[in-house]
Every structure is written in C-alpha cells, then in structure tokens.
Amino acid sequence: NLGCPSKKVQKNKFGACLIKEPDLVADCINSMVQNCKIPVTAKTRIGFDNIETFEYLNAFVKKISEAGCKTVILHARRAILKGLTPKENLKIPKLNYPMVYKIKDSNKDLEIILNGGITNTDQIIEHLNKCDGVMIGRAIYQNPYFLAEIEKRIFENTKIPTRSEIAEKLVEYVK
C-alpha cells in the first residue's frame, strides 16, 4: 500500500511517501515477487504534493511493473504529505480519472484498477470501459448493500437477495 498519507505512516517510511522513492519500491516488489507464490500488487496515488504528472506516474508504474508487479491500483488523487489529515486527503485533492485512463492506455499489458470517489454503478460502468477494474471503499463501507446493487447491474441475470433475506441469514449465523 503506497497510498496512505498519514504522518504516523510517513514517519515509519510506509504509504504515500514511498511514491518519492521508486527504486526502493521496485526493490521491495522484486523481493516480494521472488519470495511469494501469490501475485504482488501495488496500490498508490497518482502523485504527491505538487507532483501530479503523467510522466512521473508512468515512469513509477513502469519501474514497479519491471520489478514484477502486474496489477496496479491507482487512487485517482495525489497525496498531500504535509498539511492535510488522512481524512482530508480523501476529499481535498481533486480526482483525476483521465490520468488513470492515460496510464492504462500506455500500459496495456498491466492490469490497472481505478480507485477513488466511486459512489454509483454508472461510474463503475464508465470506468470499466477504460480500466481493467475498480476498487470501491467508502461507498461499500457506508452501504454494504451497494455490492448487491453492483452485482445486479453488472451481471443482470444474477438473483440478489433482499435485505430482509440477508438479515434472516445473519440471524442464523448469530445463533
């Protein structure tokens, strides 16, 4: 995870501050790829502080892909490393979906998954036309049934249980 901008995380050299150190990130990914039997993925922001250029991000993505990372999740906001809280970093930096699309266009061999600000199924469908996938966080945290709505919209023939049916099943587990 190369996306968290919190001070505590930065102090320990984790999260979004690592976007500034592509060689170190590539070394870490290479080591994980060499020592793991599962795919190694990276989730990152599209930039940091005043750096939000296609050239920088594309070079970063290429460097980590050369190290063995074949799936990159891009949070479509830059990380402001000083002056904003992690919560503010989820809202104040503007979303830049076209940057993610451009990275996908330039890296056809990589799986590029878009993250950030996705709140409805229309957005998901739009993003899926330009990226390999989407990652949704807060919208599902706030409304877990959103997953059922997505399933119904994307896979139209799927039978989705109602909230009442889900609650009945949950009661069985609680017992």
Walk through the language-model features, giving the residues of each.
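Glycine-rich, flexible loop/turn motifs
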Residues: 5, 14-15, 136, 146
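Aromatic- and acidic-residue-enriched carbohydrate-binding clefts of CAZyme catalytic domains
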Residues: 19
